[in-house]
């Protein structure tokens, strides 16, 4: 049994995702993580591995997560491939019937959404190519010479070069959308196209099943009368009212076909030469009637352009009162998580930013000159025979705050989840403590400098040093801070491993 999942369900899913982000009952977050990629793969930066989609790796994504940023309604858009118009480039034209046996002439695409049939001009206006100059002498179309710049509702040529292109204006990308969502490979489509007022003129001008283009792939032989024009030639099919004008040249061949009345309601159609009074001659011409998408051109921009991708805009930056995003260490993973929960709670996280790290407020004579190497290990003896181990994310010499993470590599497994027979620190991950037991201590030894201690006298989210207030990004209780998000909650729905960058 042969079956497919159509592109339309992909478009539907993209739209549903956008709606989900807009739903107040949901919380979507982007996240950054993984400061130690070389522990996973030595050549990570030159060849990042493809993320693995299993529960073991999902747990590791959580354990190596650094911080999260809320994705709001204005941070998500459906997008389509960005094809910038360039003089001399030949583009595919819109067709309703691309397939493996009827590929796009220019790109070779076997389906519409893989073809290069729409463009972005220099003014950030988007046009669909309804005719690319294709004719029996140029079956692959011709180079485009005139950049479309008009905003007329009806399709037309863009200039006087005679390149044969017919363009239809669809929409203009707003400056605010350009800044947030126009990328190297993708460009946004407008929100609320089906119901909004901003692009209503284009949408409301669409005619369901209205014919705009008839192409000529064979000019025929011995047609009609030389140098004649035949008007009101009917276009037959399951719609009604469409007509075209056929020009026959001096060789009694079809020179051009122009739609004079688009009609409506067509899902298939043919030109009826006989009913139009055009003698068919010895060889009938081959005329292809191009059927518009459902609703007509401009009715549903998502369906017409294949908007099954979503682009998320997430600006990863600190503010003075909530510095959750670390600096001085690298990140090599980004992702998206749906409905994570607050730490120690089943309540869905709603904060604009959240830290996924543990943190210690340290004190000691040399805290302002001590250093902790990024990704290095540090320990606390919590009690006799019990050691807490963390790996350094960063250390702030001004505030004495040490941020860290703990993953399975600290408890009997390597980074890829393989069990180790003799782990250095045992098989348990122990939390750092402001109240160590018998045989334990508050001492934390830095990479360089004098020994420091957990500052059990400090609780709060900010500290004052030399009459200046410093916000720490997360709340401390007796010198120890938990993450702000409950690890392993919600659904990680997107992961991207990438070459590491250092945040500064």
Give, region by region, the residue ranges found by the protein language model:
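Feature for peripheral, non-core segments
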Residues: 1-126, 130-504
């Amino acid at each position: 049994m042969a079956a497919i999942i159509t592109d339309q369900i992909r478009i539907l899913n993209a739209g549903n995702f956008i709606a989900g982000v807009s739903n107040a009952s949901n919380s979507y977050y982007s996240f950054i993580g993984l400061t130690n990629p070389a522990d996973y793969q030595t050549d990570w930066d030159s060849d990042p591995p493809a993320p693995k989609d299993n529960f073991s790796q999902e747990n590791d994504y959580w354990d190596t997560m650094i911080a999260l940023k809320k994705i709001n309604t204005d941070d998500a858009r459906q997008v389509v491939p960005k094809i910038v118009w360039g003089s001399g480039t030949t583009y595919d034209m819109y067709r309703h019937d691309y397939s493996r046996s009827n590929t796009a002439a220019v790109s070779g695409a076997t389906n519409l959404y893989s073809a290069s049939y729409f463009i972005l001009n220099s003014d950030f206006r988007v046009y669909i190519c309804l005719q690319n100059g294709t004719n029996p002498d140029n079956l692959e179309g011709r180079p485009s010479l005139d950049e479309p710049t008009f905003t007329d509702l009806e399709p037309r040529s863009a200039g006087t070069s005679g390149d044969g292109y017919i363009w239809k204006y669809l929409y203009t990308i707003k400056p605010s959308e350009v800044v947030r969502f126009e990328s190297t490979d993708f460009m946004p489509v407008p929100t609320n196209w089906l119901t909004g007022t901003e692009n209503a003129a284009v949408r409301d001008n669409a005619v369901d099943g209205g014919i705009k283009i008839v192409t000529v792939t064979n000019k025929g032989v011995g047609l009609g009368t030389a140098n004649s024009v035949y008007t009101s030639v009917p276009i037959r099919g399951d719609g009604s009212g469409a007509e075209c004008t056929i020009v026959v040249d001096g060789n009694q061949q079809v020179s051009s076909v122009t739609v004079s009345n688009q009609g409506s309601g067509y899902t298939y159609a043919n030109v009826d030469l006989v009913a139009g009074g055009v003698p068919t001659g010895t060889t009938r011409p081959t005329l292809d009637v191009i059927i518009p998408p459902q609703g007509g051109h401009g009715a549903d921009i998502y369906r017409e352009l294949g908007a099954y991708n979503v682009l998320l805009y997430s600006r990863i930056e600190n503010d003075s009162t909530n510095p959750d995003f670390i600096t001085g260490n690298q990140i090599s993973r980004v992702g998206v998580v749906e409905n994570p929960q607050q730490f120690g709670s089943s309540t869905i996280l709603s904060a604009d930013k959240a830290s996924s790290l543990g943190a210690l407020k340290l004190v000691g004579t040399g805290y302002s000159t001590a250093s902790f190497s990024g990704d290095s290990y540090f320990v606390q003896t919590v009690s006799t025979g019990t050691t807490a181990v963390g790996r350094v994310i960063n250390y702030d010499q001004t505030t004495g705050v040490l941020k860290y993470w703990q993953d399975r590599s600290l408890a009997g497994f390597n980074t890829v989840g393989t069990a180790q027979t003799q782990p250095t620190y045992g098989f348990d991950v122990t939390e750092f403590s402001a109240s160590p037991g018998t045989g334990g201590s508050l001492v934390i030894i830095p990479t360089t400098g004098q020994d420091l201690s957990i500052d059990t006298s400090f609780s709060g989210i900010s500290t004052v040093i030399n009459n200046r207030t410093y916000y720490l990004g997360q709340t401390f209780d007796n010198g120890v801070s938990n993450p702000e998000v409950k690890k392993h909650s919600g659904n990680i729905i997107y992961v991207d491993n990438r070459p590491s960058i250092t945040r500064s």
